[in-house]
């Protein structure tokens, strides 16, 4: 592990900082901890029938009241279970598909909690156009819990402000946090907008935290933000946040960016707890919420049920996840020993009933599987098929080479492939990605590799690794029926990042290492 990489490992692989030189790997271990009760609600929002048409403030409040009434019901249901905090989704109160003009009646005036100490429920007349904030504040008091919600807000600006829009106001996609006594304790204005013409991105990134008596410091960001350095990574790096409140309105995109998949990957990679509340509109591909710790997830994904869903879970105040370790067991797992040998350049040897066949890692014989290209996540991946019951595969693109060392208890008729992408993603956002992905293909043809599927039967014991140019690598792990699994081990070995798993309980849909090179966006 290079000195530069070691110097930054504290940021991403919590616990690896103890290893100044040499091996930095991570195994998943539990530790004793205190707990709190968290709740997230996946909300089927009542939407405006005509979001492009201008309505009155009163009409807007009447629509939002329908959603807020559901919120209050869920707060009280969570209170009966002893919840300390509840998180609601992005766009859950006002909906979406507005223009900049048509959303205006839905916006509350938003003072900064850094400048103003305010309890909207107890001081309802202090500011005009704050009816939604008042209602949320009163819910927090009634439920005796911290509450995080998302709403649209407005802020007047002067013509002397060079960034002031022509209509004389800023409009923000805003998360708010209230304490259990109704005080406004946090405001976050979404930085990385996702085709949201109704809203502005703030000139300066909000790095928002709020303190709680039950779990210390929480951070907030929204939806698309999870893929970018600001605010998500900087918030963890600079403020030592261990818990994230994450409202989102996420449209699932398989095989690499389903909602619960990226939520869990973020929690595992950074060793934090993520309270993720998604909107529930299955016809739009929008579902997938969860309470994710580095080791365990309580999630909900349902494309059939039209109604919302409340998740409540008991989670550690100090999440335990990636713990830096050298091998301390008397006997190393045989598959991991084989991985280390292959990584060091030793020949990979495959045993059958008649002989032992060895191929040097750098030399591929004439029977090696063919390389092909297929579109995955709108990107041109280079792939090789995964054939046989065991093997070692390699596939490269630009500076990234991905490897798979695998064994299969039984063959299935399904086609799997190992894919690599190292380049700038340019569809539905622009950002640089390095990805190694083991995926089930949609059919028997190579051209189906990368298609969106959610059911699988194939079982693997495997190591997946690559020579990533970034520290920020997210382990994506999705199994049949939109279920989540956790790696047995993650970490760096000889400047390669790896994921190890044995004993899958259901068929593998996706196992991937999703690297982000933030500086090359």
From Swiss-Prot:
UniProt KW Secreted keyword: yes
Signal sequence span is: 1-25
Q: Which residues are glycosylated?
A: 128, 181, 380
Q: Name one GO biological process term.
A: biotin metabolic process
Where does the UniProt annotation locate this protein?
Secreted, Extracellular space
Active site as annotated:
90, 190, 223
Keyword Membrane recorded: no
**InterPro entries (alphabetical):** Biotinidase-like_euk, Biotinidase/VNN, C-N_Hydrolase, C-N_Hydrolase_sf, Vanin_C
Q: Which GO terms label this protein's molecular function in UniProt?
A: biotinidase activity
Any Gene Ontology CC annotation: extracellular region
Query: Per the record, what are the reactions this protein catalyses?
Result: biocytin + H2O = biotin + L-lysine; biotin amide + H2O = biotin + NH4(+)
UniProtKB keywords: Glycoprotein, Hydrolase, Secreted, Signal
Highest taxon of source = Eukaryota
Q: What is its EC number?
A: 3.5.1.12
Name the predominant localization. secreted
Domain CN hydrolase residue range list: 50-329
Q: Which family does it belong to?
A: Belongs to the carbon-nitrogen hydrolase superfamily. BTD/VNN family.
Give the protein's biological function. Catalytic release of biotin from biocytin, the product of biotin-dependent carboxylases degradation.
Q: What is this protein called?
A: Biotinidase
The encoding gene is Btd
């Amino acid at each position: 592990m290079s000195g530069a990489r070691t110097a930054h490992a504290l940021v991403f692989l919590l616990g690896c900082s103890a290893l100044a030189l040499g091996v930095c790997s991570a195994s998943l271990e539990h530790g004793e901890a205190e707990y709190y009760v968290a709740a997230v609600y996946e909300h089927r929002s009542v939407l405006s029938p005509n979001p492009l048409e201008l309505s009155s403030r009163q009409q807007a409040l009447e629509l939002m009241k329908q959603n807020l009434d559901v919120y209050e019901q869920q707060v009280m249901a969570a209170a009966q279970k002893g919840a300390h905090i509840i998180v609601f989704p992005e766009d859950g109160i006002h909906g979406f598909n507005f223009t900049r003009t048509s959303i205006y009646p839905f916006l509350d005036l938003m003072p900064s909690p850094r400048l103003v100490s305010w309890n909207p429920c107890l001081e309802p007349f202090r500011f005009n156009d704050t009816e939604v904030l008042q209602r949320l504040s009163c819910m927090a008091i009634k439920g005796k819990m911290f509450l995080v919600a998302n709403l649209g807000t407005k802020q007047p600006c002067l013509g002397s402000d060079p960034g002031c829009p022509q209509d004389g106001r800023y409009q923000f996609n805003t998360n708010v946090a209230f304490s259990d006594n109704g005080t406004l304790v946090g405001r976050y204005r979404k930085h990385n907008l996702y085709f949201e013409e109704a809203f502005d991105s703030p000139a300066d990134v909000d790095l928002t935290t709020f303190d709680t008596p039950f779990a210390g410091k929480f951070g907030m960001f929204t939806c698309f933000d999870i893929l970018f350095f600001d605010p998500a990574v900087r918030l963890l790096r600079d403020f030592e946040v261990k818990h994230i409140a994450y409202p989102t309105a996420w449209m699932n995109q398989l095989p690499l960016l389903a909602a619960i998949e990226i939520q869990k990957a973020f929690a595992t990679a950074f060793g934090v707890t993520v309270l993720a509340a998604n909107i529930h509109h299955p016809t739009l591909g929008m579902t997938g919420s969860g309470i994710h710790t580095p080791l365990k997830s309580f999630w909900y994904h349902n494309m059939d049920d039209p109604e919302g869903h409340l998740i409540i879970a008991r989670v550690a105040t100090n999440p335990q996840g990636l713990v830096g370790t050298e091998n301390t067991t008397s006997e190393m797992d045989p598959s991991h020993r084989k991985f280390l040998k292959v990584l060091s350049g030793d020949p990979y040897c495959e045993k059958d009933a008649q002989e032992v066949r060895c191929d040097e890692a750098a030399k591929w014989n004439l029977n090696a599987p063919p390389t092909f290209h297929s579109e995955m996540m709108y990107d041109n991946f280079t792939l090789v098929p995964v054939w046989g019951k065991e093997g070692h595969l390699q596939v490269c693109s630009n500076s990234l080479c991905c490897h798979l060392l695998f064994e299969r208890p039984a063959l299935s008729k399904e086609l799997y492939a190992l894919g690599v992408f190292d380049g700038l993603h340019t569809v539905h956002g622009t950002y640089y990605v390095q990805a190694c992905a083991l995926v089930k293909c949609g059919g028997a043809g190579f051209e189906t590799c990368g298609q969106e599927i959610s059911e699988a039967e194939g079982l693997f014991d495997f190591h997946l690794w690559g020579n990533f140019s970034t520290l920020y690598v997210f382990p994506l792990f999705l199994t049949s029926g939109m279920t989540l699994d956790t790696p047995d081990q993650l970490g760096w070995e000889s400047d390669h990042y790896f994921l190890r798993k044995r004993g899958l309980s259901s068929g593998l849909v996706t196992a991937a290492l999703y690297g982000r090179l933030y500086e090359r966006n």
